[in-house]
Amino acid sequence: ASDVYKRQPLNLNALMSQYKTELNALIDNPAEPLDEIAEKWNYYLSGNVEPGRDRDVSPLIDAEFDQGGSWNNGIQNAIGFNGPSGCVAIAMCQLMHYWGYPEHGDGSTFYTENDYGYIEVDFEDAFYDFDNMAALYATSASQLLLFHAGVSVNMDYDWSGSGAMVVGSYPSAFYAMENFFGYHSDISFQWKDNHTDNEYRNIIKEELDNNRPIIAQGYGNSADSGHAWNIDGYEDDYFHCNWGWGGSSNGYFYFNNLNFSSS
């Protein structure tokens, strides 16, 4: 089991750790089920279960980008690093691959990376060739986009896991998508803590109903262990998660067990 755990995406490992924590808490402190859960049990135990779903959206994203191997050739060629490209960059790139946009970016940026020094990218002069950006294997086009996405969020490249911010002012994915990659200024992030579970669930479903996959952000037991991934479909209250590890462990996960902070 430990070997399987090591092969899982880091963001999924965080979810599994959350499952474990919640189960242990329930074992140690038995509690009455929430009304919503009790109703579901009553329904399934009634013997009158009918197949079918009221609402669902099949996975929208066909990209299965990965954090290692040849996917990182653009990063390696630029700065000599061929470790994990970072879940934030992957989530951004899979979203851009879905929309096939932009052909060119806006402006430029630079920063000094902790281990690899000064890095600069001119987004405006770049050509993002989505027609030659395969969904399941790395090409020079996807390698370039992954490198530029990482620089756009001032990626902290590290062999144990490369990190960057999803939301907030520069540098973040939220800022970069609008200011460097030309996405509409109406894009927004929603903090889960500002909504009831039902409200938040419906916000995500409405986006997916309108064929708009999202970037989700969540944290494990430590505030330092943040992760990003794409949510691109759902069946009832199970959401399809693309973890950004070459398709590994992509699947449907129950809403209440997804440890969101924003989307």
Task: Go through the PLM ranges and name each one.
Residues 34-82, 141:
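Extracellular zinc-dependent metalloprotease catalytic-domain scaffold
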Residues 175, 179-239:
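Active-site-adjacent substructure of cysteine-protease-like catalytic cores
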Residues 29, 37-44, 182, 245-263:
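A recurrent domain-boundary module in secreted/ectodomain proteins
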Residues 65, 103-169:
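Surface-exposed loop and adjacent secondary-structure segments within mature catalytic domains
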Residues 94-97, 102-103, 151-166, 183, ...:
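Solvent-exposed loop/turn segments at secondary-structure junctions
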Residues 73-124:
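Active-site nucleophile-adjacent alpha helix/oxyanion-hole segment immediately C-terminal to the catalytic cysteine
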Residues 1-5:
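Short, small-residue-biased leader/transition segments that mark boundaries at the very start
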Residues 80-97, 138-147, 155-177, 225:
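Active-site nucleophilic cysteine motif
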